[in-house]
């Protein structure tokens, strides 16, 4: 599970230019938070009547600390075990370090029920009356530069970290930890990538 952190807006001309994309691994603090939040959202979606369940959640991670906060709404009688899900997520990522271990990190929850005012706005049956709440959705674009229809710099940046994670989990490379980052710079001519000019990979290690 990787993310593109920055996008440079450029004009597509016949001139040559450089375009750089960056990826972070599942062990990067930003992604740890994303994955914990995803585990919780998935739990709500697995319950009855998922279309009426609501999750607006923030996760904070620091040295041996995980904090979740926000507001939710699930079916009557449903109690989400936030701590269990957070530990499962961190275990899946692979953190078993002295300063951050899935078994013994300190967990705090400040999650509460959804505001009735927000519920009233987002629950309207008529689309004309339906509000947007305060959550947004980010989006990207598809192109023909790669087989998966992603821009080439971010595709190769992702691919590097996927192989690094595989090597770590299969122990073909020893001593590396979950937090890593890659950056790939390609040279373009017009709208076509023609050359790789720089690759940077950094990883947490023993």
Question: Language model features by range: what are they?
Answer:
Residues 1-11:
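Short, Lys/Arg-enriched N-terminal segments with co-localized hydrophobic residues
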Residues 10-54:
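N-terminal, positively charged regions that mediate nucleic acid binding
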Residues 20-23, 64, 89-206:
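Glycine-rich, mobile lid/loop segments that gate access to catalytic sites or pores
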Residues 28-31, 82-83, 117-119:
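N-terminal low-complexity, intrinsically disordered segments
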Residues 50-60, 172-178:
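Short, glycine/acidic-rich hinge or "gate" loops at secondary-structure transitions
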Residues 55-75:
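Short, charge-patterned binding micro-sites
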Residues 75-82, 149:
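Short, conserved charged micro-motifs
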